[in-house]
Amino acid sequence: MFIIIFASIVLILVGVFFLWHLVLSRAPNPSLKTGQVSIGNNVFTVELATTTIQQARGLSFRTSLTTGTGMLFMFSPGVQNFWMKDMNFPIDMIWIAGDKVAGFAENAQPQPGVPLWKLTIYTSPDGVDKVLEVNANTVTKDNIQIGSPVTIGPGTDF
């Protein structure tokens, strides 16, 4: 009897973990607001990470991003720090100050199995108030440069 109960509990826990993983790995997240960001002639459809929880989670657990999409974070101006915790694919991080690209971290790689305290921290220049995460190599492919103009599309509400 004990074995049956134990096996049942294990199966239930495995099922709960599997469902939890499916929920966290779906993309895009329908509970996030969406908008548009233009950098030069490039237009990105973005999900808006507006709450602390959404910003902490970011793109973690997802398996990919569709080309031309990304996630936009908005902050008070300052130095922003990002990491690749629980990420499954490489990204470019575009640092934005006001309406201009202030810099970027290109081809940031996932670090599976690396303890939190050893994860690489990607640090923006000072004065950054927005960060756009996009697929790796987007900065190079789309010729995004420091000083490129940035426009947050109409209807993109934080």
Segments predicted by a language model, with ranges:
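Compact, glycine-rich, soluble single-domain proteins
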Residues: 2, 16-158
